[in-house]
Amino acid sequence: MAEDIKTKIKNYKTAPFDSRFPNQNQTRNCWQNYLDFHRCEKAMTAKGGDVSVCEWYRRVYKSLCPISWVSTWDDRRAEGTFPGKI
């Protein structure tokens, strides 16, 4: 059990500093990485490329964004009412 927790902590990677978002409030950073992930995923799927290159954006937004925001945005994307341009 303790080894499992140590492994999780060792492998945990949080969002690195992004100079586009120097302030303490990281809401915009969260939003931008969510959009970037889905744009990257859409572009790579259209080209028939490997979607795993987009994984960095997903890890960053998963680290920064509250789960409730992500689930709401996912629901809105599925419904076609998402306000962002993907």
UniProtKB/Swiss-Prot annotation:
Topology class, membrane: Peripheral membrane protein
Short sequence motif Cx9C motif: positions: 30-40
SUPFAM superfamilies: Cytochrome c oxidase subunit h (SSF47694)
Transmembrane regions: none
Keyword Membrane appears in the UniProt entry: yes
GO BP terms, alphabetized: oxidative phosphorylation
Domain CHCH: 27-73
Record pathway: Energy metabolism; oxidative phosphorylation
Highest taxon, organism lineage: Eukaryota
Motif (Cx10C motif): 54-65
Localization annotation: Mitochondrion inner membrane
GO cellular component term, pick one: respiratory chain complex IV
SS bond partners: 30-65, 40-54
UniProt entry keywords in alphabetical sequence: Acetylation, Disulfide bond, Membrane, Mitochondrion, Mitochondrion inner membrane
Broad class of where this protein is predominantly found: mitochondrion
Residues found modified as N-acetylalanine: 2
Subunit structure: Component of the cytochrome c oxidase (complex IV, CIV), a multisubunit enzyme composed of 14 subunits. The complex is composed of a catalytic core of 3 subunits MT-CO1, MT-CO2 and MT-CO3, encoded in the mitochondrial DNA, and 11 supernumerary subunits COX4I, COX5A, COX5B, COX6A, COX6B, COX6C, COX7A, COX7B, COX7C, COX8 and NDUFA4, which are encoded in the nuclear genome.
Similarity field: Belongs to the cytochrome c oxidase subunit 6B family.
Function: Component of the cytochrome c oxidase, the last enzyme in the mitochondrial electron transport chain which drives oxidative phosphorylation. The respiratory chain contains 3 multisubunit complexes succinate dehydrogenase (complex II, CII), ubiquinol-cytochrome c oxidoreductase (cytochrome b-c1 complex, complex III, CIII) and cytochrome c oxidase (complex IV, CIV), that cooperate to transfer electrons derived from NADH and succinate to molecular oxygen, creating an electrochemical gradient over the inner membrane that drives transmembrane transport and the ATP synthase.
PANTHER family the UniProt entry points to: CYTOCHROME C OXIDASE SUBUNIT 6B
Name of the protein in question: Cytochrome c oxidase subunit 6B1
